[in-house]
From Swiss-Prot:
Signal peptide (UniProt feature, chain positions): none
Example GO biological process: mitochondrial translation
UniProt name for this protein: Small ribosomal subunit protein mS41
Pfam family name, one: SAM_Ribosomal_mS41
Gene that this sequence comes from: FYV4
Length: 130
C-alpha cells in the first residue's frame, strides 16, 4: 500500500516522465541568424581558424546543422575531438553574442611545463657546461 503523503505526488511524477524529451527542444529557439560578418557556415569556419574550414562539407553548408549538432553527431561524422570541442565552444560563443575569433594553439616551451621547468633548466645547464 502506498502511503497517502506520496500518492498525491505520484501522478505528477508519471506525468513529467512521460512528457516529450527535453533534447528535442534543446536548440529550437537558440539558433541565431547569420550576421553580415558571418553570413554562412563556410565564413564561420574560416573565421574561427585552426583548419576548421576543411569541415565545410561535413556541415553541408547548412546553418541549422552547425547549431543543432552536438559532439556525438560530430564524432559520427569523423571530426576529431580537438576540433569538435573547439567548434562547439565557438558556436556557444556566437550563440551568446560573444565575439568569435581564432584562438591559436599553445606552444610548448623548450624546457617543459611550469611544474618541472626548474629541474629541466638545471639539467640542461649542467649538460652544456661540460
Amino acid at each position: 500500500m502506498i502511503p497517502s503523503r506520496i500518492s498525491h505526488k505520484f501522478p505528477l511524477f508519471l506525468r513529467s516522465s512521460l512528457a516529450a524529451p527535453k533534447a528535442a527542444y534543446r536548440f529550437s529557439s537558440t539558433i541565431p541568424k547569420p550576421s553580415d560578418q558571418v553570413p554562412d557556415v563556410d565564413a564561420f569556419l574560416n573565421k574561427i581558424g585552426r583548419n576548421c574550414n576543411e569541415l565545410k562539407d561535413t556541415f553541408e553548408n547548412n546553418w541549422n546543422n552547425l547549431f543543432q549538432w552536438d559532439s556525438k553527431i560530430l564524432k559520427e561524422k569523423g571530426v576529431n575531438i580537438q576540433q569538435r570541442k573547439y567548434i562547439l565552444k565557438q558556436v556557444h560563443n556566437y550563440r551568446n553574442n560573444r565575439p568569435i575569433h581564432e584562438i591559436k594553439l599553445g606552444k610548448k616551451s623548450f624546457f617543459g611545463g611550469e611544474r618541472k621547468r626548474k629541474a629541466f633548466t638545471a639539467k640542461w645547464k649542467a649538460e652544456n657546461k661540460q
